[in-house]
């Protein structure tokens, strides 16, 4: 979450008159992340997060906000969008689409262990089960179609080794389509900083603005590639005990099919490719912003290389 669009206290106070959330008490910009402008907002009635959507297509926003509202109604600890006085989740502020959601308690964990990975697996299974009844549809906006478009834009900017790795992985992924795998709404960005913990339990899952409909297994692959590394700085191979905790806790609520087990190595590579591409895009084609936080693309290049080299032995029972 970065700050690209400035919002003053007076502007926000006026905007909040369209909501039944009390009057503004405090406004704090949030610098973490890279996609949207975010502020922590405190009013006389509660704590919220204000998001101004900087580049997400307006047609996609109702899917994200509706999914959050749906999951919150089903007991998933995620931000609940606040409707304005016209009963709309989406509004406009300083020329940008904007939404106000509840701010959850808790904090992210930098070094998750077996317990935290099991907590994540169970929560992800609950999310996927609750998502079955969500009626709206949006194809994963960072799926294969986006990979190919991003690769075309980035290819001239990459060195020969990076181009070769990218071309080979796109070729490999094109060999695999999984129409028979369980599908539904996925978070698709559930990194450690998008999960909050309090007293040893997951207290919240945030930042649903890359959500879409995809293979449910993709969500687990994204999580494994971030939560289950031996060491995020020095050894980005998968830690088998943490992977086992993630998968077993998930499977206790939604058992895996044989097809999902077979697809796991491909999904791990797909998840690594997706985030390598997005980090390359933000590195080589950055946007101007007041507070902008970008990630090093070398991290997921390394993850992708390791997953491709270890594809035969990545499922952990």
Task: Give the location of each predicted region.
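An alpha-helical support segment within catalytic cores of ATP-dependent transferases
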Residues: 7-18, 135-136, 147-188, 198, ...
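ATP-binding pocket architecture of kinase catalytic cores
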Residues: 42-135
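ATP/Mg2+ or Mg2+-diphosphate-binding catalytic cores
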Residues: 141, 152-153, 275-317
């Amino acid at each position: 979450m970065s700050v690209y669009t400035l919002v003053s206290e007076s502007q926000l106070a006026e905007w909040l008159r369209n909501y039944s959330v009390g009057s503004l008490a405090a406004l704090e910009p949030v610098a973490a992340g890279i996609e949207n402008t975010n502020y922590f907002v405190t009013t006389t009635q509660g704590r919220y997060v204000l998001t101004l959507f900087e580049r997400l297509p307006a047609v996609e926003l109702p899917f994200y906000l509706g999914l959050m509202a749906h999951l919150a109604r089903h007991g998933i600890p995620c931000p609940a969008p606040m409707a304005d006085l016209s009963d709309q989740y989406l509004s406009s502020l300083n020329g940008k689409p904007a939404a106000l959601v509840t701010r959850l308690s808790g904090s992210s964990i930098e070094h998750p262990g077996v317990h935290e990975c099991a907590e994540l697996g169970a929560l992800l299974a609950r999310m996927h089960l609750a998502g079955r009844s969500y009626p709206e549809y949006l194809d994963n906006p960072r799926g294969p179609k986006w990979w190919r478009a991003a690769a075309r834009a980035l290819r001239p900017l990459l060195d020969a080794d990076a181009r070769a790795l990218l071309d080979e992985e796109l070729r490999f992924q094109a060999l695999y389509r999984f129409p028979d795998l369980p599908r539904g709404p996925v978070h698709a960005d559930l990194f450690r900083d998008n999960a909050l913990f309090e007293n040893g339990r997951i207290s919240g899952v945030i930042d649903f603005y890359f959500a879409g409909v995809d293979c449910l297994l993709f969500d687990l692959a994204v999580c494994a590639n971030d939560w289950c590394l031996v060491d995020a700085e020095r050894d980005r191979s998968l830690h088998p005990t943490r992977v086992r905790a993630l998968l077993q806790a998930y499977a206790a609520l939604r058992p895996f099919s044989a097809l999902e087990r077979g697809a796991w190595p491909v999904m791990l590579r797909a998840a690594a490719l997706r985030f390598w591409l997005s980090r390359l895009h933000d590195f080589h084609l950055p946007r101007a912003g007041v507070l902008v936080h970008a990630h090093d693309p070398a991290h997921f290049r390394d993850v992708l290389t390791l997953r491709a080299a270890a594809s035969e032995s990545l499922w952990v029972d």
